[in-house]
Amino acid sequence: PWYTTRNQIQEVVESKRDWIMKKLEEYNVSPRKAKEYEDGEKFQILGESYYLNIYYKDINNAILNVENEKIEIILPLSYAEEDNTEQIKKMIDKMYYMIAEKEVESAMEKTRKMVGLAPEEYKIKKIKYAWGTCSSRKVITINQNLMMYSRKAIEYVVLHEICHLKYMNHSKKFWEMV
């Protein structure tokens, strides 16, 4: 929260130091190169690597398939000479959103059974600075880009935000609940 002192923040970070270091190693956090949405590019889905394959065929509408570690995008032949980066980006964003709908619903249900709490409402969207948020109106928002990480990571973020329904802070009681 905005009123938290620097010392309080430092205490929490220090108390979670081992966990933070373990997670940094686990996820190998490093600056990521911006996606170019090109054939052969690697994307993460639920913690697994998938490679983008772009094809052009005699069809009317674009198609996206995800299977066997591949994201296959088939575009109409008439698009072959154009820059399709924006369309491919939109298709991949929609793919992540659709995955998020299923995965977040599952994580919400699992967490509801575990802690007996559920939000009034939840949303899925891109958030620039957080994996999830919980508003004072008890609305949880989950970042659709979280779908790049494992189900355990998704379940943790959902649990974290649901615990904010009871404790709208990062107090000791909040962390005990998490």
For the regions a protein language model found, what residue spans apply to each?
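Walker B catalytic acidic pair
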Residues: 161
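Active-site-proximal or metal-binding-adjacent scaffold patches in catalytic folds
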Residues: 1-156, 165-178
